[in-house]
Amino acid sequence: FPENISQVHFIKLVLKDEKGKDVSSNFYWRSNDKYEGSKTLTGPTSSGFEDLSKLKAAKVKLSYKTRQADGRYFVDIVMKNTSNGIAFFNQLQFLNSKMSPIRPSFYSDNFFSLIPGEKKTVTIETGEEKLADGAVLVLKGWNIDTQKYKLK
């Protein structure tokens, strides 16, 4: 890594197929601190990440569509980071009217970061019977304002 890299930095790896379509991606955050030990289990694995608290606020635009099929309920969510900085460590939640998780619910992805301009689609699936009391979709993250949507 270059000597002038920031104390905390981010690495995004994307695997594409022969047509250029994303197949898989991984996102990492890394500290400049030197880790001791052969596999860092004996090193200061939490050291050097204090600068995460200095991340500037980011904005994520969210839209969603709901659909039903074969007794299943789906929420297709599209999110885009519209800011110039990273939207770090975001989480989607699918909650009932009492703000408790709807279980079981299956997420195509969760706990993700978005680089500037990045768009991400996530689908949440559950049984239609789980929605008797309504549902709330929540997006929250390290440096974004929490967003809540009451689903119909």
Q: Over which residues does each language-model region extend?
A:
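Structural beta-strand segments of beta-rich domains
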Residues: 71-77
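Short, hydrophobic/aromatic beta-strand segments
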Residues: 25, 85-93
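Short beta-strand and strand-turn-strand segments in soluble, beta-rich domains
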Residues: 94-110
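Edge strands and adjacent loops of beta-rich recognition modules
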Residues: 36-70
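Short strand-edge motifs at loop-to-beta-strand transitions and within beta-strands
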Residues: 110, 118-122
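Terminal connector regions
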Residues: 1-49, 103, 125-152
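Asparagine-centered strand-capping/turn motif at beta-strand->loop junctions
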Residues: 77-84
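Beta-strand-rich interaction surfaces with strong enrichment in secreted/lumenal proteins
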Residues: 1, 64-65, 108-114
